[in-house]
Each structure stands twice: as structure tokens, then as C-alpha cells.
Amino acid sequence: MNIIQQLEAEQAAKIEAKRTLPEFSPGDTVRVNVKVTEGNRTRVQAYEGVCIARSGGGLQENFTVRKISYGEGVERVFPVYSPLIESVDVVRRGKVRRAKLYYLRDRRGKSARIVEDTGVRARKLNDAERAAVAEEKARIEAEKVAAAQALAAEKAAAEAAEAKAAAEAAAAAETAAE
């Protein structure tokens, strides 16, 4: 592995640590959540469409997503390792026989449809994706429970300290009254 490939692998690993992309291929309907900056405000915008191509390799890998917006075809090219991509969700798997689906540009209506893939590979990928999502939800739920328990313990300790201080104050007042 030469130095360039090594640096690219390190950068890709750094980005993968922040967010993981599901395995998807041309023909799949994907929802790409992109960070959009408008003025001084940043928000996340969902862009849903059919992945019609994947090109490049390493850090320069791109994928093209096509959607029909108000009757007009719109294509957008996303770099896979872009920091502006927050997440990519696979909505449905498509069954195609080509790597580049540029022929969809000339088609409208039913002829532009892509049949859903219900094969073993698609099922396995969907199950793996669902398991990853469920695992992530369980992790988040566990963090919430741990935070709630820590808050309850902190509150109980504060109440105990408050009760102890009140008892000491009452004892001091009682000794002063004698």
C-alpha cells in the first residue's frame, strides 16, 4: 500500500467512525440526509431518490441520486466521504442488471420504475440494517436509562444532604433553646 492509499484509508476510517453508511448499490432508493447552511443557520435536508450510479474509488467515491421533483428530473452527486452527509438510509432495494442507470433519464412513468429486489442478498442486507438500527436504538435507550438513574441518585443525595442539614439545624436550634 503506497502512502496516498494509506492516508486515504486513515481519512476514510476517521469519517466512518463518525457515521457508517449502509451498503447500497445502483437501483436502490435511498434517503440522503445532507447538512445545508442557509446564512448562519444549519439544518438537515433529506434528499430521496434512486441511486443511478456509483463511481470513483477511495476518498473520491461518489454516488448519483435521481428524483423527480414537480415533474422535473433532478440529479445530485454526493461524495461518499463528504462531511456534509449526515446519514444515508436505504428505503428499498432495487433489482437492476446495470451499474449505471443513465437510461432512466429518458424514461417517464411506468417505464422508469425499478422492480424491488426480494432476493436472499437484499433480505440479508435489510435484516443486517434493521439489526444495526435496533442496536443503535437500544444503546440510546440504555444511555437514557443510565442518565435517568444518575439524575435520580443525584437528586436522592441532594435530598439526603438537605434533610441532614435540616436535622442539624433543628438540633442546633434545640440546644440553643435550652
From Swiss-Prot:
SUPFAM superfamilies: Translation proteins SH3-like domain (SSF50104). Signal peptide: none annotated. GO terms for biological process: translation. The keyword Ribosomal protein applies. Pfam families: Ribosomal_L19 (PF01245). GO terms for molecular function: structural constituent of ribosome. GO terms for cellular component: cytosolic large ribosomal subunit. Keywords: Ribonucleoprotein, Ribosomal protein. PANTHER family: LARGE RIBOSOMAL SUBUNIT PROTEIN BL19M, RIBOSOMAL PROTEIN L19. This protein is located at the 30S-50S ribosomal subunit interface and may play a role in the structure and function of the aminoacyl-tRNA binding site. Belongs to the bacterial ribosomal protein bL19 family. This is Large ribosomal subunit protein bL19. It comes from Rhizobium etli (strain CIAT 652).
